[in-house]
């Protein structure tokens, strides 16, 4: 048993050393759920104080996957993280689905449950040393308003910077140019993005 403990300790030290020797553009080192607490402590806030939080939901999206609202913001976060020296928090895969909950595969979280959940996550990110919190939202409707409201509350109360980005707002002109229309839910906007991920 003692031998296993010593080998595990040596392996941990070796892997931790390898982590710091790696090129920081290596994506897995940007994902908070893929590093250990010692690596996290060495990175936040001394090397970065910015975090990307992908949010979405599970709901029908026509012919594409029910998790498209999660897939797109996470893929964007991986690209943005490399360019902005940010870490990526785990994707929040459940949201305020409302009108889609009658369809198979949809999951509805009420606003009354979602609002304090999001607030506690944002406060936890602040507590862990993040001063810049960027929410990359993959789902519209009431979820967008809740995210914006809670992010503003946390920014004021905790003296940090927050930003909510609805990625589809930036894709509107491109989808009009390529497809001749703006798209929308389960339309041209999410399908190409999720097809490229």
Please report, for each region that a protein language model flagged, where it lies by residue:
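Positively charged n-region of N-terminal signal peptides that target proteins for export
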Residues: 1-5
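Bacterial N-terminal signal peptides
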Residues: 6-18
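Active-site and ligand/interface coordination hotspots across diverse enzymes
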Residues: 22-62
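Active-site histidine-anchored catalytic micro-motif
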Residues: 24-35, 96-188
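Extracytoplasmic strand-loop-helix segments at the start of, or within, the mature domains
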Residues: 53-55, 60-81
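Active-site machinery of serine-nucleophile hydrolases
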Residues: 77-94
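A conserved mid-domain beta-alpha-beta active-site/ligand-binding segment of alpha/beta enzyme cores
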Residues: 186-197
């Amino acid at each position: 048993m003692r031998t296993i403990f010593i080998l595990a300790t040596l392996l941990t030290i070796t892997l931790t050393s390898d982590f710091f020797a790696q090129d920081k553009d290596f994506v897995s080192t940007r994902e908070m759920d893929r590093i250990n607490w010692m690596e996290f402590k060495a990175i936040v806030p001394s090397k970065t104080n910015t975090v990307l939080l992908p949010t979405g939901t599970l709901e029908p999206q026509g012919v594409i996957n029910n998790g498209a609202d999660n897939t797109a913001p996470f893929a964007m976060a991986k690209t943005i993280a490399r360019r902005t020296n940010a870490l990526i928090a785990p994707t929040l895969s459940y949201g305020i689905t409302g009108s889609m909950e009658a369809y198979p595969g949809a999951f509805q979280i009420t606003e009354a449950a979602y609002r304090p959940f999001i607030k506690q996550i944002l406060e936890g990110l602040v507590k862990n040393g993040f001063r810049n919190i960027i929410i990359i939202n993959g789902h519209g409707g009431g979820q967008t308003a809740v995210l914006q409201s809670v992010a503003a509350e946390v920014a004021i109360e905790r003296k940090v910077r927050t930003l909510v980005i609805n990625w589809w707002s930036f894709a509107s002109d491109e989808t009009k140019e390529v497809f001749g229309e703006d798209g929308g839910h389960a339309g041209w906007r999410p399908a190409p993005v999720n097809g490229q991920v």
